[in-house]
């Protein structure tokens, strides 16, 4: 299996087979175990990794940096003020230059087309750290966390609550149905997923036996839920939409009433973070002052409850990103897992 990843880009979930995606999850679990036991796993010894960031980041930057160092590579951060993608230099030219200097390239930004161009012209593996359309490294962490809690993925029901047309919702739908996970999107009709994304997921669901539900009805959405998942109500670049999103998405908040509707004591709660569950941030205070809402997509009660697994999920970003880099770029002594 290892050989099928060598030299490949990691740009979107739809580019991989079920077996490949599940292998990366299992490989990440193996690397996590090595990390916990203090066993070196320097599959990228002597490699140089470029980390390109148009968008700000805490978890993605920290995960790629620590993962690269653990693997023996040198990570070099290039922020929005350091790169000229499409401004003073075309993406194609930038890709060709960076590909001569680095062994692998991570990109976190707005345009999916841009990361695809990097992948087309760099000549080295390119990894999507997030775009407006897809968030594939997050999915590996999410579904690793699910598997750690339930021992399997096939047949699990995951309910995403909130903005059903953002990158996380897109990726949850496609990655989940690819692996046999039932995915429910609980969202207002105005924010239902794009039809093309749903059709793509339906194709995967037909192969895997997964079930898809897109609804604005809470009772329908959480019926049979094993996982409740939410994300911020306003994505990066949409800050002018705060007022309308708060009004529109308040009924889709993950709170204890919604948890109780699921009627599953083994249920877990996931969030890709950051979460606006209180007013202990400048952002949270500002929203509370302007709109009278002290808790947004998830209540503080749920966020701190026994159901919460989001900090495990955040840690798993590092282990899964490590798996992607090692599999696509690593020296070929990766064990079978």
Curated annotation (Swiss-Prot):
Positions contributing to carbamoyl phosphate binding: 57-60, 84, 108, 135-138, 272-273, 317
Residues the entry annotates as binding L-ornithine: 167, 231, 235-236
Biological-process GO terms, alphabetical: arginine biosynthetic process via ornithine; arginine catabolic process to ornithine; citrulline biosynthetic process
Catalysed reactions listed for this entry: carbamoyl phosphate + L-ornithine = L-citrulline + phosphate + H(+)
Signal peptide (UniProt feature, chain positions): none
Keywords assigned by UniProt, alphabetized: Arginine metabolism, Cytoplasm, Transferase
UniProt cross-references to HAMAP family, sorted A to Z: OTCase
GO terms of molecular function: amino acid binding; ornithine carbamoyltransferase activity
Function statement: Reversibly catalyzes the transfer of the carbamoyl group from carbamoyl phosphate (CP) to the N(epsilon) atom of ornithine (ORN) to produce L-citrulline.
Family statement: Belongs to the aspartate/ornithine carbamoyltransferase superfamily. OTCase family.
Enzyme class, spelled out: transferase
Chain segments annotated as coiled-coil in the UniProt record: none
Primary location group: cytoplasm
Pathway note: Amino-acid degradation; L-arginine degradation via ADI pathway; carbamoyl phosphate from L-arginine: step 2/2
Any one GO cellular component localisation term in the record: cytoplasm
Domain of life: Bacteria
Protein name, entry field: Ornithine carbamoyltransferase
Compartments in which it is found: Cytoplasm
EC code(s) of this entry: 2.1.3.3
InterPro entries in UniProt: Asp/Orn_carbamoyltranf_P-bd, Asp/Orn_carbamoylTrfase, Asp/Orn_carbamoylTrfase_sf, Asp_carbamoyltransf_Asp/Orn-bd, Orn/put_carbamltrans, OTCase_ArgI
């Amino acid at each position: 299996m290892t050989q099928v990843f060598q030299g490949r880009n990691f740009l979107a979930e739809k580019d991989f087979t079920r077996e490949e995606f599940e292998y990366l999850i299992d490989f990440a679990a193996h690397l996590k175990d090595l990390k916990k036991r203090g066993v070196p796993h320097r599959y990228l010894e002597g490699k140089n990794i470029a980390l390109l960031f148009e968008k700000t980041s805490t978890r993605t930057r920290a995960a790629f940096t620590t993962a690269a160092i653990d693997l023996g590579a040198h990570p070099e951060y290039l922020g929005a003020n350091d790169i000229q993608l499409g401004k003073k230099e075309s993406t194609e030219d930038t890709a060709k230059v960076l590909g001569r200097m680095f062994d692998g390239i991570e990109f976190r930004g707005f345009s999916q087309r841009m990361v695809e161009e990097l992948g087309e012209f760099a000549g080295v593996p390119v990894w999507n750290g997030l775009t407006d359309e897809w968030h594939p490294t997050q999915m590996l962490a999410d579904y690793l966390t699910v598997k750690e809690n339930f021992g399997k993925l096939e047949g699990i029901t995951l309910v995403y609550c909130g903005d059903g047309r953002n990158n996380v919702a897109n990726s949850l739908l496609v990655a989940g149905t690819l692996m046999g996970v039932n995915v429910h999107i609980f969202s207002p009709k105005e924010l239902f997923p794009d039809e093309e994304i749903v059709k793509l997921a339906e194709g995967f669901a037909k192969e895997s036996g997964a079930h898809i539900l897109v609804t604005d009805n809470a009772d329908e959405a959480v019926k049979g839920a094993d996982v409740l998942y939410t994300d911020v109500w306003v994505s990066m670049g949409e800050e002018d939409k705060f007022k309308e999103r708060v009004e529109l998405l308040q009924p889709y908040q993950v709170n204890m009433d919604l948890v109780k509707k699921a009627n599953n004591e083994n249920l877990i709660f996931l969030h890709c973070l950051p979460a606006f569950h209180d007013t202990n941030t400048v952002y949270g205070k500002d929203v509370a002052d302007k709109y009278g809402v002290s808790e947004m997509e998830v209540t503080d009660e749920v966020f701190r409850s026994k159901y919460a697994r989001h900090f495990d999920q955040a840690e798993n970003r590092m282990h899964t990103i490590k798996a992607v880099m090692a599999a696509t770029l690593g020296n070929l002594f990766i064990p079978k897992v």
